[in-house]
Amino acid sequence: ISKLFVDSEKIAWVITNLLSNAIHHSPEKSRIIVGAVQHEKAVEIYVRDFGRGIDPRYHKSIFERYFRVPGTKVQGSGLGLAISKEFVEAHGGTIGVESEIGKGSRFSILLPV
């Protein structure tokens, strides 16, 4: 994996937020996978959980300030993913989600090298 020249505190905050979300939205004792993939001009860091999943119609909205998926029982402000997006984009990167109801979620950040 290539070296990344980033604000380590901000990117650590993003990864911690993604991990915290995965833990809070997963069944007790389920596994969470964290990994990194080298691409030609970027490094992808991802967090995969096996929780409830997110309806695809909310995939864009979850990155907006104060948005919370309807019916979510986990406490939160609706700011974590919006702040994560701001931090990642400030580094010239992107953040995204792949998820289906009942199949968990995979959040990834792509940072240029």
Language-model segment annotations:
Residues 22-23:
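Short helix-loop "hinge" at the ATP-lid/N-box region of the Bergerat-fold HATPase_c
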Residues 53-61:
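Short helix N-cap motif at coil->helix boundaries in the Bergerat
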Residues 49:
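Acidic ATP/Mg2+-coordinating residue in the GHKL
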Residues 80, 84:
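Short alpha-helical Gxxx[C/S/T] motif in the catalytic ATP-binding
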Residues 3-6:
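Conserved micro-motifs of the catalytic ATP-binding
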Residues 29-41:
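Short beta-strand/loop element within the Bergerat-fold HATPase_c
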